[in-house]
Amino acid sequence: FFTGANFTVDRFNMANLGGDTTISQWTTPWHGLEAVLDYRNVALGLAVLFLSRMLALHYFMNDIDDTQIRERSRRRSLCTAGTFLVFFLVFLVSLLFAQGWSVDPATGIIAPEPYKYLHNLLAMPYVGIGLLAGVALVLWSIWLGWRGSRKAIWLSGSGTVLTVLALSLIHISE
């Protein structure tokens, strides 16, 4: 999504009745597994892993009426949230300072652009507000979850949706 992939697309193969109808092909023998060598992909994957753990712990605190489970979930949520925040911040900072690709509307030439995603975020203030609101909701839910509140799941879920939506929108801007 943000770091690219080594593959080619040949749409003319769709009309190739007698031969190969494969539209996309990997250009390396790794078939996309080389993406794990980029630290941004690893940071995003681990951030998603620990965010899903945190959401599950918040869900347990909200829906399971057992004081022992609720207390264990509360204790584990703080460590899980801290680990999530480290990996999410690594991903977010590296994304905002990463080089992206832009299209010159006059010539149609695709060229690298430094700080592309930061420029996209600054060009769309509503998306920036959505990103900040989503991050704030997740941070607030971490604090509520640590205090044992049953409402943490609602804030963390809403914050996750806003943050993922904003990250998707800064990718597609021209």
What is each residue range found by the language model?
Residues F1-K151:
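Long, contiguous internal "core" modules enriched in hydrophobic/ aromatic residues
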Residues W154-L162:
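Central hydrophobic cores of alpha-helical transmembrane segments
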Residues L162-S168:
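Aromatic-anchored segments of alpha-helical transmembrane domains
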Residues I170-E174:
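Conserved small/polar residues in nucleotide/adenosyl-binding loops
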